[in-house]
Amino acid sequence: MGAVSFTSMSSSIAALTVSGYRSLRDLALPLGQLNVITGPNGCGKSNLYRSLFLLHRAADGLLARTLSEEGGMPSVLWAGARKKGPVRLQIAVSFTDGLTYHLACGLPEVNDLPSSFKLDPLIKEEKATFSERGSQSVTLLERAKSGASLRDNNGGWVHFPLALSRSESVLSQLAEPHRYPHLSALRERLRGWRFYHAFRTDEQAPLRQPQVGVFTPVLSDNGHDLAAALQTIIEAGDTEGLWRAVRQAFDGGELLITLPQDTSDGRFSVQMRLPGVLRPLHAWELSDGTLRFLCLLAALLSPRPPAVLALNEPETSLHPDLLSPLAALIVQASAQSQMWITTHSVRLSEEIQRLSGVSPITLRKTDGETRTLYHK
């Protein structure tokens, strides 16, 4: 069989399928360019978000650590009634360019060697395939308990030559990216997804204090480099879009970045000039909601937009008046990134729908199981 090729590193996700993970017994979700996930508390929105995040972390070799932060494998498996057969957590993703990736993990078996790491996942299956429209599917990676076989750059099968970590993805263990270009491209695709959930805005948060800054086209996941990220947008991104968003959100307010050459300690810091206030307010004086909105601005206006950008409950701590400007920014960002938004806010989801014409995906929980509203 000859070599195969797929060229788009930024291909969108066509569908996400999750089974055996917390409240997700068996859920298949088709996705578009802009996806807003809504539903009541406890319906499973965050579980869906986390399942996508698990694939991202698996590509970086951090699957076991990420699951351990959730309590380990026994804590994350579907706890409801099961059919007979192996207990598995399975996540699969298919892309619009014909690429698919499937990862299944489970618990240690009775005859496995004794280990103190009983909360770690054991990878049971891993598979990647590629199918161009109208052509037969080509397997790029197939892993079972006995080992893994990979498609190389000549289109031939190679048995993975190194000992595999049983709790991590093959993708994270590739040592010769030039030899396995398709799998390396898949790994970089998953690693390139971007997730934002918990910006630190407490009194001791780094973003409230001046920070040494470097060129920062991608805001960190906790927002500690906010000042540098905003200055990067000013110098190398949508400067006018940034100024406009700040003015609209804060009734004519003005964003100020104190630069190293303006200070004795050579650090960047955020300030805001607000209507009716006679002096600029420093970051340590700004509200949690104001700082969170500025973090969202930096994420959504990144000069290096990701293929997939996921925001989990972006409305947290925001004043209701900020939801319309936020919705506009999300819709604008969807022109360059596939967006995944989980939200409790009816107002935010309705405003996104008004601006984009995209209806939200509504979840519910029935007998402990997460389902979409149209699920039968």
PLM region descriptions:
Residues 2-9, 324-376:
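C-terminal lobe/lid and adjacent interdomain/linker elements of RecA-like ASCE P-loop ATPase modules
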Residues 4-25:
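N-terminal pre-Walker A segment at the start of P-loop NTPase domains
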Residues 26-32, 301-304:
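Phosphate-binding P-loop
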Residues 33-70, 222, 293-294, 347-350:
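Phosphate-binding glycine-rich loops of NTP-binding sites
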Residues 49-115:
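Conserved P-loop NTP-binding catalytic core
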Residues 81-84, 299-304, 331-335, 353-355:
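Conserved catalytic network of the ASCE P-loop NTPase/AAA+ motor domain
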Residues 97-244:
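Electropositive, glycine-dotted interaction segments
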Residues 225, 231, 240, 247-251, ...:
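Conserved ABC ATPase signature
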